[in-house]
């Protein structure tokens, strides 16, 4: 527990126990680092000083441990970071700690922040997707302290999004705890399309670095790597000619690819024992040189059975015998009538949409796929007992099995959250599927594509997706892997913050998290809440029937061309009400400088959305009535949008590269 005294408040007496961090607006302690700090320890010290210097004192120092004795003018308090000698002398060891775990211990006038650290730069060590792989437990300890004791919140990337309370005095009670990841893996995939769409490459670089730091502060990290992708993308090239029996039998008796198919989409004949033998042989060859590991998720202890990116297709008698009986097999165009789709049409033709199962009269292939998982696992156990297998809940095997029971050594990557819209019925169906998989005995990794919606428009999904996340966390979730962080901070901020905050605090309610966000707007908090409540109502008003009309007119909508549906989602009257509410928020901010800056950030996002929709409207008018006048109007709308982005990109309101890519490829802009 911390006793924090806000500016202007003086207590009658201070408690005897504990340690002063800030006293009368001055640093009451010094930050101590090892003589030769690891990059993670240096990063942790820098992050701690950065935040403390904004919490009420500006004179916190970082001092190497060996020179402490010669610095007589330093404050008496000590905050030891990482592997200091004083930490070892205090009997604190990280040897048995989990990866990405940190210890916090305060006793007397000493505070120890230490964790399981590995060599390598923290931010530079994150991979292309923004994945934090190198353990930095000391950094985790620092963030845990800043969040829980100092009540610091990171609403969005950059200084403006840092909500840091200011104290005249701050005293920390004696405490000891360990901060550990809530999941064995957590990932919110970073979108990184380079500098296209940015006017200034330096702004692009700063934006990406700020997002990486935000991901770290929200503690997205890989204690274990549970992200197994499509596992058989090379099989057609390897075995298509020599072992065609490894692959799906199509309704016409051929084994192989769908019309227009490519090698990486070839689907397997999962009941074939020869295929099982090949999979195990490949696994043994790939892991033979690896030493034994106690981790259940080490590569040598895991077999990846995640099928390629297509629905299950095999019509051979053995695979069909593995299916649970369903009347829909006889009536379905593919299974009952032999209609073979093209590769491009494979998902809707087999009754699924971008990985999420549907109820369009298509049978579920989950019993077949789960028997595949169990059969290979049983064969692997004969070689090495206790093997873990990874599979998908995807496409036409997204629903839980009807008959097969599994075990906790089967890990299912669950893709089954709806893409859009997030109607109550769709979310209820997704929860039913999740609970069904858990009841079948598996553990799950949440792997949705749901956060790819919205382009730069004010889509609001914090409540519906946030509540489903909390349910998953309580019911068998051991990892997450979200696609993706699209970076639309000024229009989708509450939703992005909610999904980030839940990563480190899934115990918090969505309402509590949203209150954290709104409270940061000071006197404008209620008005900002009203503003986003409006967008929540607009977002939740989209019904399946309305969406089907939209897609019936525009064709299939995915994240690649979601903007094309923007005017149907956000009609003029909705945008006008949003403009009225943001003006009210600006007025409510009054003379509060920080509140005004933050509301202005949101207002810039709304202007950005308005200009984007104006360009879309001009394009749709041109498509309906091609003419020189309409062509000029569209060009002028695009230029106005371009000029706004050039002026606003340094403010970090949006990932301009993400928008440029899908406006160009999905909507035909910027040619």
Model-found features: residue ranges?
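Acidic, contiguous N-terminal accessory segments
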Residues: 2-3, 9-99, 168-176
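Extracellular/periplasmic catalytic domains that process cell-envelope and extracellular macromolecules
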Residues: 23-25, 71-74, 104-107, 296-298, ...
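Structural recognition of the beta-strand scaffold that forms the well-ordered cores
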Residues: 30-32, 78-81, 112-114, 189-190, ...
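Structural motif
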Residues: 33-37, 80-85, 114-117, 192, ...
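Short acidic, S/G/P-rich loop/turn micro-motifs used as interaction or catalytic elements
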Residues: 36-40, 85-88, 119-120, 310-312, ...
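Feature activates predominantly on carbohydrate-active enzymes
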Residues: 44-47, 51, 94-370, 381, ...
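Short, internal active-site loops enriched in acidic
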Residues: 68, 308-313, 394-401
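Substrate-binding groove of N-acetylhexosamine-processing glycoside hydrolases
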Residues: 165-166, 178-179, 356-671
């Amino acid at each position: 527990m911390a006793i924090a005294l806000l500016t202007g408040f003086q207590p009658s007496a201070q408690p005897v126990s504990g340690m002063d961090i800030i006293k009368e607006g001055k640093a009451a302690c010094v930050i101590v680092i090892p003589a030769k700090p690891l990059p993670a320890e240096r990063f942790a010290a820098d992050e701690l000083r950065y935040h403390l210097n904004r919490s009420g004192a500006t004179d916190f120092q970082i001092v190497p441990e060996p020179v402490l004795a010669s610095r007589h003018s330093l404050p008496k308090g000590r905050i030891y970071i990482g592997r200091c000698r004083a930490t070892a002398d205090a009997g604190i060891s990280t040897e048995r700690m989990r990866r990405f775990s940190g210890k916090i211990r305060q006793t007397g006038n000493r505070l120890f922040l230490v964790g399981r650290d590995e060599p390598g730069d923290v931010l530079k060590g994150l991979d292309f997707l923004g994945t934090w792989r190198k353990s930095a437990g000391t950094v985790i300890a620092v963030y845990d302290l800043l969040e829980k004791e100092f009540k610091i919140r990171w609403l969005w990337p950059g200084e403006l999004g840092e909500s840091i309370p200011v104290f005249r005095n701050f005293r920390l009670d004696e405490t000891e705890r360990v901060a550990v990841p809530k999941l064995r893996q957590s990932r919110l995939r970073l979108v990184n399309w380079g500098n296209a769409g940015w006017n200034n490459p330096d702004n692009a670089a700063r934006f990406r670095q700020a997002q990486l730091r935000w991901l770290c502060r929200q503690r997205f990290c890989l204690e274990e790597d549970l992200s197994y992708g499509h596992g058989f993308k090379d099989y057609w090239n390897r075995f298509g000619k020599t072992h065609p029996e490894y692959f799906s039998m199509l309704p016409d008796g051929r084994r192989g690819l769908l019309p227009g198919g490519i090698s990486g989409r070839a689907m397997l004949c999962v009941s074939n024992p020869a295929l099982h033998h090949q999979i195990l042989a490949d696994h043994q060859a790939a892991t033979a040189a690896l030493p034994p590991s106690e981790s259940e998720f080490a590569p040598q202890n895991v077999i990846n059975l995640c099928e390629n990116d297509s629905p299950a297709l095999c019509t051979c008698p053995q695979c069909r015998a593995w299916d649970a009986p369903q009347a829909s097999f006889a009536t379905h165009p593919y299974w009952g009538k032999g209609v073979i789709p093209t590769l491009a049409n494979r998902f809707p033709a087999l009754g699924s949409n971008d990985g999420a199962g549907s109820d369009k009269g298509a049978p579920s292939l989950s019993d077949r796929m789960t028997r595949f998982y169990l059969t290979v696992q049983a064969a692997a156990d004969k070689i090495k007992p206790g093997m873990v297998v990874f599979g998908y809940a995807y496409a036409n095997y997204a629903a839980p099995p009807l008959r097969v029971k599994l075990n906790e050594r089967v890990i299912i990557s669950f893709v089954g959250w709806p893409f859009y819209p997030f109607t109550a019925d769709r979310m209820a169906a997704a929860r039913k599927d999740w609970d069904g998989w858990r009841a079948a005995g598996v553990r799950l990794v949440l792997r949705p594509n749901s956060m790819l919606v919205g382009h730069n428009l004010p889509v609001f999904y914090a409540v519906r997706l946030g509540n489903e996340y909390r349910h998953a966390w309580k019911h068998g979730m051991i990892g997450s892997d979200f696609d993706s962080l699209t970076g639309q901070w000024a229009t989708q901020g509450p939703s992005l913050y909610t999904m980030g905050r839940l990563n480190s605090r899934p115990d918090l309610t969505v309402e509590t998290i949203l209150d954290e966000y709104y409270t940061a707007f000071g006197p404008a908090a209620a008005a900002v809440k009203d503003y986003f409540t409006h967008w929540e109502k607009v977002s939740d008003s989209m019904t399946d029937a309305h969406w089907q009309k939209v897609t019936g007119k525009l064709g299939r909508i995915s994240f690649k061309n979601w903007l094309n549906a923007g005017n149907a989602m956000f009609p003029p009257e909705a945008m006008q009400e949003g403009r009225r509410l943001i003006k009210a928020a600006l007025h409510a901010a009054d003379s509060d400088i920080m509140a005004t800056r933050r509301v202005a950030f949101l207002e810039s996002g709304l202007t950005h959305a308005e200009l984007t929709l104006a360009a879309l409207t001009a394009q749709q008018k041109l498509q309906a009535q091609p003419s020189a006048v309409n062509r000029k109007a569209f060009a002028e709308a695009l230029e106005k949008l371009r000029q706004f982005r050039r002026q606003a990109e340094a403010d970090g309101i949006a990932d301009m590269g993400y928008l440029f890519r899908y406006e160009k490829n999905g909507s035909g802009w910027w040619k």
